[in-house]
Regions:
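Conserved acidic
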Residues: 97
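A charged helix-plus-loop insertion that forms the helical arch/lid used to bind
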Residues: 83-94
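N-terminal, polar/charged subdomain of small-to-medium soluble alpha/beta proteins
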Residues: 1-84, 100-142
Length: 142
């Protein structure tokens, strides 16, 4: 999930672990069992190239503008709520699978020249953001 923001931060265990000041992207990354490095790289590139910002020549991407990205893992994106009142997380990949793929997303963005801040994988996090628009989009790379 991608959000266009005017600033965002993530705290874990009462510590600020990632922050972007001003315009940029908040990328909430969920990983499922069938995801791999290829999907992680495509997600990073698609997010950074998505034209969500106004520029002098029309709509431009975070990559065009050199904007920062806050990457936060979020297994709850794969919640299954079809039965009952209690979500299940069976579709979310386990930590040993998901953590390196979230790192691939961040590394791919850095390779593109983005300033990347991250959350702390597996921690209870508090994410604060100013959603601009609001623009919130579910990205799918399959």
């Amino acid at each position: 999930m991608i959000q266009r923001v005017d600033g965002a931060r993530v705290d874990a265990d009462d510590d600020e672990v990632g922050v972007i000041d001003g315009p940029g992207l908040l990328l909430l990354v969920g990983v499922t069992h069938t995801d791999g490095e290829s999907q992680a790289r495509r997600l990073a590139n698609k997010a950074y190239d998505m034209r969500l910002f106004d520029g002098d020549s029309g709509e431009v991407s975070a990559g065009d503008l050199g904007l920062p990205v806050l990457v936060v893992s979020q297994f709850t994106l794969y919640a299954d709520t079809r039965k009952g009142r209690r979500p299940t997380w069976d579709a979310a990949a386990p930590g040993p699978v998901a953590e390196p793929l979230v790192a691939v997303v961040a590394d791919e963005l850095r390779a593109r020249g983005a300033h990347v801040a991250t959350g702390r994988f597996g921690a209870h996090m508090r994410v604060s953001l100013v959603n601009d628009g609001p623009v919130t989009i579910v990205l799918d790379v399959d």
